[in-house]
Amino acid sequence: MKPEYKPFVDALIELAIREDIGDGDHTSLCCIPATEKGRMRLLCKQEGILAGIEIAQLVLRRLDPDMQFEQILRDGDRVKPGDVAFYVSGRLQSLLQAERILLNIMQRMSGVATQTAVYADKIKDLHTKVLDTRKTTPGMRVLDKMAVKIGGGENHRMGLFDMILLKDNHIDFAGGIRPAIEGAKAYLKAKGKNIPIECEVRSLEDIDEVFAAGGVDRIMFDNFTPELTRQAVAKVAGRCGTESSGGITLDTLREYAETGVDFISVGALTHQIKSLDMSLKAC
């Protein structure tokens, strides 16, 4: 895990514990002795890409630092029904408290990783890389971003703070591409910040405006057809990075990648996923 992710993950785990356990897991407290210990296993019940083991360990140890964790599989492993990802031993009350929290996290992360792998594998022989977006579940973006990387994709910006992305609304409100880019560069200089600038374009003519304003780190082709994307890539001619975005599906992904564009951003990696089926069972 990247060091900068840790505070977000710790905060998410604390929130998950508060919302699920509240003032106590009264079901476990009423029928399981506090000193009783046991062992459980994480059982995979569906084919896919495993993700979230690192987070599961943090959940378990937050609830009981004395948990004994025996890892069998790793994040990024391809799994099938019947595979065991890990065994964990400790106080039964703590194991039962952790069960749903870690399953919710691992099932979603594995779903994102599995979806990403489908997209990434389709163009793995090409130069183009698949990017995620900010279309994530509020509060879970770090986990979604981690899962995308595990599945073979690449991360776009984390949020509004680590890249300037001049999209259509920014450009329109700023009065055009040139004033938007010039304003962005002046702002970064005044603030002493060093973050990349990306600018969305809606036509081939817009590309000329970008370079007339001094250029940016990456140009985003918004809702271009594959043929128009090919022309746009040729027009940029390697002067900056390129990205395709807008309505690109698994069916059209390869056609866009074959244009030579550097990146394709796909919101479906994180907002149209199905959680991977798995369970935590006594053994």
Segments from the language model and where they lie:
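A short helix->loop->beta-strand "cap" motif at the edges of active sites that frequently abuts
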Residues: C240
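Cys/His-rich Zn2+-binding cysteine-cluster or related metal-binding knuckle/ribbon modules and their
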Residues: L250
